[in-house]
Amino acid sequence: MEDHGYAYSVLEKLSFNRVAGTEDEKKAAQLLLSEIEQAGGKGELMEFPIPASTVTQEGMRIVSPYAREVETIGYGRSGSLPEGGKTLKFYYAERGVAEDYVGMDDLSDTAVMVNSISYEAYRLLCEKHAAAFIVMRGFHYDTLETANAYRKNLGDEKIRLGRIPGFMISAKDATEMVRDGVETVHLTLVQNEFEATSRNVLAVIPGTEYPEESIALTAHYDSVPV
Protein backbone atom coordinates (compact mmCIF):
# COMPACT_ATOMS: atom_id res chain seq x y z
CA MET A 1 0.00 0.00 0.00
CA GLU A 2 1.33 3.46 -0.86
CA ASP A 3 1.97 5.90 1.96
CA HIS A 4 -0.98 8.15 1.15
CA GLY A 5 -3.26 5.10 1.05
CA TYR A 6 -2.05 3.98 4.46
CA ALA A 7 -2.46 7.47 5.91
CA TYR A 8 -6.02 7.61 4.60
CA SER A 9 -6.81 4.22 6.13
CA VAL A 10 -5.66 5.47 9.55
CA LEU A 11 -7.81 8.59 9.17
CA GLU A 12 -10.79 6.37 8.40
CA LYS A 13 -10.19 4.42 11.60
CA LEU A 14 -10.05 7.71 13.54
CA SER A 15 -13.28 9.05 12.03
CA PHE A 16 -15.20 9.40 15.30
CA ASN A 17 -15.48 12.05 18.02
CA ARG A 18 -12.38 11.94 20.19
CA VAL A 19 -13.06 14.60 22.83
CA ALA A 20 -10.19 14.93 25.30
CA GLY A 21 -10.69 13.03 28.54
CA THR A 22 -13.30 10.59 27.20
CA GLU A 23 -13.23 6.86 26.51
CA ASP A 24 -13.25 7.65 22.79
CA GLU A 25 -10.04 9.66 23.14
CA LYS A 26 -8.49 6.69 24.95
CA LYS A 27 -9.67 4.42 22.12
CA ALA A 28 -8.01 6.73 19.56
CA ALA A 29 -4.74 6.77 21.53
CA GLN A 30 -4.68 2.98 21.73
CA LEU A 31 -5.38 2.75 18.00
CA LEU A 32 -2.39 5.01 17.24
CA LEU A 33 -0.19 3.04 19.62
CA SER A 34 -1.21 -0.16 17.85
CA GLU A 35 -0.32 1.34 14.46
CA ILE A 36 3.11 2.33 15.80
CA GLU A 37 3.79 -1.17 17.09
CA GLN A 38 2.56 -2.82 13.88
CA ALA A 39 5.06 -0.67 11.98
CA GLY A 40 7.86 -2.04 14.18
CA GLY A 41 8.16 0.97 16.45
CA LYS A 42 7.84 1.40 20.19
CA GLY A 43 5.45 3.80 21.84
CA GLU A 44 3.82 4.60 25.17
CA LEU A 45 0.82 6.46 26.53
CA MET A 46 1.56 9.36 28.88
CA GLU A 47 -1.50 10.23 30.98
CA PHE A 48 -2.24 13.61 32.57
CA PRO A 49 -5.28 15.19 34.29
CA ILE A 50 -7.52 17.78 32.61
CA PRO A 51 -10.57 19.71 33.90
CA ALA A 52 -13.86 18.46 32.47
CA SER A 53 -17.60 18.79 32.95
CA THR A 54 -20.84 17.00 32.14
CA VAL A 55 -23.97 19.06 31.48
CA THR A 56 -27.02 17.28 32.94
CA GLN A 57 -29.68 19.94 32.29
CA GLU A 58 -29.86 22.78 29.79
CA GLY A 59 -32.69 24.80 28.34
CA MET A 60 -33.94 28.18 27.18
CA ARG A 61 -37.51 29.41 27.04
CA ILE A 62 -38.73 32.82 25.96
CA VAL A 63 -41.13 34.10 28.65
CA SER A 64 -42.23 37.50 27.33
CA PRO A 65 -43.64 39.08 25.28
CA TYR A 66 -44.48 35.59 23.97
CA ALA A 67 -43.63 32.00 24.89
CA ARG A 68 -41.35 29.73 22.89
CA GLU A 69 -38.68 27.12 23.49
CA VAL A 70 -35.25 27.89 22.03
CA GLU A 71 -32.77 25.12 21.25
CA THR A 72 -29.57 25.73 23.17
CA ILE A 73 -26.25 24.17 24.12
CA GLY A 74 -24.77 25.05 27.50
CA TYR A 75 -21.12 26.03 27.86
CA GLY A 76 -19.07 23.46 29.76
CA ARG A 77 -17.21 24.68 32.88
CA SER A 78 -19.27 27.90 32.94
CA GLY A 79 -21.08 27.07 36.18
CA SER A 80 -24.70 26.26 36.95
CA LEU A 81 -27.93 28.12 37.58
CA PRO A 82 -30.14 27.27 40.58
CA GLU A 83 -32.14 24.04 40.33
CA GLY A 84 -35.23 24.70 38.26
CA GLY A 85 -33.56 27.49 36.32
CA LYS A 86 -33.89 31.25 36.50
CA THR A 87 -36.05 33.85 34.74
CA LEU A 88 -33.95 36.81 33.61
CA LYS A 89 -34.21 40.00 31.63
CA PHE A 90 -32.85 39.70 28.10
CA TYR A 91 -30.42 42.22 26.62
CA TYR A 92 -28.61 42.14 23.29
CA ALA A 93 -25.18 43.77 23.68
CA GLU A 94 -24.08 43.20 20.06
CA ARG A 95 -20.24 43.28 20.09
CA GLY A 96 -20.11 43.31 23.88
CA VAL A 97 -17.83 46.36 24.05
CA ALA A 98 -18.09 49.25 26.53
CA GLU A 99 -20.21 51.34 24.15
CA ASP A 100 -22.87 48.62 24.19
CA TYR A 101 -23.40 49.05 27.95
CA VAL A 102 -23.86 52.81 28.28
CA GLY A 103 -25.81 53.51 31.47
CA MET A 104 -25.81 49.84 32.47
CA ASP A 105 -23.75 48.93 35.52
CA ASP A 106 -25.48 46.02 37.27
CA LEU A 107 -26.71 43.17 35.06
CA SER A 108 -27.12 40.60 37.83
CA ASP A 109 -30.75 40.07 36.77
CA THR A 110 -29.97 39.91 33.04
CA ALA A 111 -28.98 37.36 30.41
CA VAL A 112 -26.75 39.19 27.95
CA MET A 113 -26.45 38.06 24.34
CA VAL A 114 -23.30 38.94 22.39
CA ASN A 115 -22.17 38.18 18.85
CA SER A 116 -19.06 36.36 20.07
CA ILE A 117 -17.42 35.74 23.41
CA SER A 118 -13.94 37.26 23.17
CA TYR A 119 -11.82 37.73 26.28
CA GLU A 120 -12.70 41.43 26.42
CA ALA A 121 -16.42 40.74 25.94
CA TYR A 122 -16.31 38.21 28.77
CA ARG A 123 -14.34 40.56 31.02
CA LEU A 124 -17.05 43.20 30.65
CA LEU A 125 -19.76 40.64 31.38
CA CYS A 126 -17.97 39.81 34.64
CA GLU A 127 -17.49 43.50 35.42
CA LYS A 128 -21.23 44.09 34.92
CA HIS A 129 -22.12 40.98 37.00
CA ALA A 130 -24.18 39.46 34.18
CA ALA A 131 -26.35 36.55 35.36
CA ALA A 132 -25.78 34.60 32.13
CA PHE A 133 -24.38 35.05 28.65
CA ILE A 134 -25.74 33.90 25.30
CA VAL A 135 -23.66 33.54 22.13
CA MET A 136 -25.00 33.04 18.62
CA ARG A 137 -23.62 30.47 16.21
CA GLY A 138 -23.67 30.45 12.40
CA PHE A 139 -25.42 32.76 9.94
CA HIS A 140 -28.87 34.33 10.28
CA TYR A 141 -30.48 31.41 8.44
CA ASP A 142 -28.71 28.65 10.41
CA THR A 143 -30.09 26.27 12.99
CA LEU A 144 -27.67 24.77 15.51
CA GLU A 145 -27.53 21.65 13.35
CA THR A 146 -26.72 23.43 10.09
CA ALA A 147 -24.19 25.62 11.92
CA ASN A 148 -22.35 22.45 13.04
CA ALA A 149 -22.64 23.60 16.64
CA TYR A 150 -21.05 21.55 19.41
CA ARG A 151 -20.53 22.03 23.13
CA LYS A 152 -17.67 24.32 24.01
CA ASN A 153 -15.87 24.75 27.30
CA LEU A 154 -15.18 28.06 28.95
CA GLY A 155 -11.41 28.55 28.80
CA ASP A 156 -9.13 28.91 31.82
CA GLU A 157 -8.30 32.53 31.00
CA LYS A 158 -11.99 33.44 31.23
CA ILE A 159 -12.65 31.27 34.28
CA ARG A 160 -9.98 33.23 36.14
CA LEU A 161 -12.22 36.29 35.73
CA GLY A 162 -15.22 34.43 37.19
CA ARG A 163 -17.84 31.95 36.05
CA ILE A 164 -20.97 33.06 34.21
CA PRO A 165 -23.39 30.36 33.00
CA GLY A 166 -23.17 30.37 29.21
CA PHE A 167 -25.47 29.31 26.38
CA MET A 168 -25.10 28.89 22.63
CA ILE A 169 -28.06 29.37 20.27
CA SER A 170 -28.41 29.54 16.51
CA ALA A 171 -28.01 32.87 14.75
CA LYS A 172 -31.48 32.27 13.31
CA ASP A 173 -33.05 32.15 16.78
CA ALA A 174 -30.91 35.07 17.94
CA THR A 175 -32.05 37.19 14.99
CA GLU A 176 -35.69 36.38 15.68
CA MET A 177 -35.35 37.16 19.39
CA VAL A 178 -33.93 40.61 18.67
CA ARG A 179 -36.43 41.27 15.88
CA ASP A 180 -39.40 40.24 18.03
CA GLY A 181 -38.33 42.27 21.07
CA VAL A 182 -37.77 39.48 23.60
CA GLU A 183 -37.84 40.90 27.13
CA THR A 184 -37.38 37.94 29.47
CA VAL A 185 -36.09 34.37 29.18
CA HIS A 186 -36.01 31.37 31.48
CA LEU A 187 -32.65 29.61 31.47
CA THR A 188 -31.66 26.23 32.85
CA LEU A 189 -28.10 24.95 33.23
CA VAL A 190 -26.84 22.30 35.61
CA GLN A 191 -23.45 20.63 35.22
CA ASN A 192 -20.94 18.60 37.17
CA GLU A 193 -17.24 19.42 37.03
CA PHE A 194 -14.55 16.81 37.57
CA GLU A 195 -11.00 15.83 36.68
CA ALA A 196 -10.68 13.61 33.62
CA THR A 197 -7.65 11.78 32.25
CA SER A 198 -6.18 12.64 28.87
CA ARG A 199 -3.05 11.21 27.31
CA ASN A 200 -0.26 11.79 24.84
CA VAL A 201 1.02 9.10 22.50
CA LEU A 202 4.83 9.11 22.52
CA ALA A 203 6.96 7.27 19.97
CA VAL A 204 10.67 7.52 19.25
CA ILE A 205 12.16 6.69 15.85
CA PRO A 206 15.96 6.35 16.24
CA GLY A 207 18.00 8.29 13.72
CA THR A 208 20.23 6.44 11.27
CA GLU A 209 22.74 9.06 10.23
CA TYR A 210 22.71 11.30 13.32
CA PRO A 211 21.22 9.17 16.14
CA GLU A 212 22.45 11.59 18.81
CA GLU A 213 20.20 14.36 17.43
CA SER A 214 16.43 14.66 17.87
CA ILE A 215 13.59 16.17 15.87
CA ALA A 216 10.29 16.59 17.73
CA LEU A 217 7.04 16.36 15.78
CA THR A 218 3.69 16.99 17.49
CA ALA A 219 0.06 16.83 16.42
CA HIS A 220 -3.37 16.72 18.05
CA TYR A 221 -5.28 13.48 17.68
CA ASP A 222 -8.15 14.44 19.98
CA SER A 223 -11.25 16.52 19.33
CA VAL A 224 -11.03 19.52 21.64
CA PRO A 225 -14.11 21.67 22.38
CA VAL A 226 -12.70 25.22 22.61
Identify the function of each model-found stretch:
Residues 1-5, 9-111:
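Noncatalytic luminal/extracellular "stalk/propeptide" segments of secretory-pathway proteins
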Residues 3-23, 32-42, 111-115, 132, ...:
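Catalytic-core environment of secreted peptidases
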Residues 13-14, 125, 177:
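A generic structural signal for nonpolar/aromatic side chains embedded in well-ordered alpha-helices
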Residues 51, 120, 138-141, 174, ...:
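Surface-exposed, flexible loop/turn segments at secondary-structure boundaries
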Residues 77-99, 151-226:
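Soluble metallo-hydrolase cores and metallopeptidase-like ectodomains found primarily
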